[in-house]
Amino acid sequence: MINDVISPEFDENGRALRRIRSFVRRQGRLTKGQQLALDSYWPVMGVEYQAAPVDLNTLFGREAPVVLEIGFGMGTSLVTMAANNPQQNFLGIEVHSPGVGACLSSAHDAGLSNLRIMCHDAVEVLENMIPEASLDMVQLFFPDPWHKARHNKRRIVQTPFVELVKSKLKVGGVFHMATDWQPYAEHMLEVMSGVSGYLNLSEQNDYVPRPDSRPLTKFELRGQRLGHGVWDLMFERKE
């Protein structure tokens, strides 16, 4: 599970298959609690990557709206949302194993049955595992902004990714993004506005107020006290 975050980067002839990725693989050191959670709860809540579509109703054992979160960090907000919305199914994707372990532990403590976790490249999951027009919401909160200009190409929000997300959303489904880096917020808005088939849910056609459905993190609360801004964007699939 942990050692298969990305698919092979070379084909059988040794040709590079690698694409530009929005994350850097850093294994990190697992605490004893995180390792215990991985050993104990991954068999219940963990989902192994496969290069074929998965039936989401079968995955969760029921039919319900599905929310996909990309890059959930330590899982605090994701677990809170899943606990607050038992009528929805939540699928979280994170590439760093300490975060996966922490999220599994918190989800177990909360007694959640509507949360599944993956440890893999989210782009590959979207491309190969998620059926077309199957998601009610995709959440991307505080992705790496890749501040330096020469690294901007690593930002996950690019036109091909936005098109991919749209294809996986149901008509009426929503792509919700949040960032605390204004240049990235402006980049998100520019990219999203350039892709047809989306409707910006902002009345001013830019950013929306933070919806109550997105919990405030400790990091965000600290930023607010320091006067830092946060920008939320919500776009609905219209076609």
UniProtKB/Swiss-Prot annotation:
Residues 150-155 are annotated as: Interaction with RNA. One of its GO terms (molecular function) is tRNA (guanine(46)-N7)-methyltransferase activity. Substrate binds at K148, D180, T217, K218, F219, E220. It catalyses: guanosine(46) in tRNA + S-adenosyl-L-methionine = N(7)-methylguanosine(46) in tRNA + S-adenosyl-L-homocysteine. Transmembrane segments: none annotated. PROSITE patterns: SAM_MT_TRMB (PS51625). Pathway: tRNA modification; N(7)-methylguanine-tRNA biosynthesis. It holds the Pfam family Methyltransf_4. InterPro entries: SAM-dependent_MTases_sf, tRNA_(Gua-N-7)_MeTrfase_Trmb, tRNA_methyltr_TrmB_bact. It is an enzyme of class 2 (transferase). Its EC number is 2.1.1.33. Coiled coil: none annotated. S-adenosyl-L-methionine binds at E69, E94, D121, D144. GO terms for cellular component: tRNA methyltransferase complex. The keyword tRNA processing applies. The active site is at D144. Keywords: Methyltransferase, S-adenosyl-L-methionine, Transferase, tRNA processing. The keyword Methyltransferase applies. Gene3D superfamilies: Vaccinia Virus protein VP39. Catalyzes the formation of N(7)-methylguanine at position 46 (m7G46) in tRNA. Monomer. PANTHER family: 3-DEOXY-D-MANNO-OCTULOSONIC-ACID TRANSFERASE/TRNA GUANINE-N 7 - -METHYLTRANSFERASE, PENTACOTRIPEPTIDE-REPEAT REGION OF PRORP DOMAIN-CONTAINING PROTEIN. Belongs to the class I-like SAM-binding methyltransferase superfamily. TrmB family. NCBIfam families: tRNA (guanosine(46)-N7)-methyltransferase TrmB. This is tRNA (guanine-N(7)-)-methyltransferase.
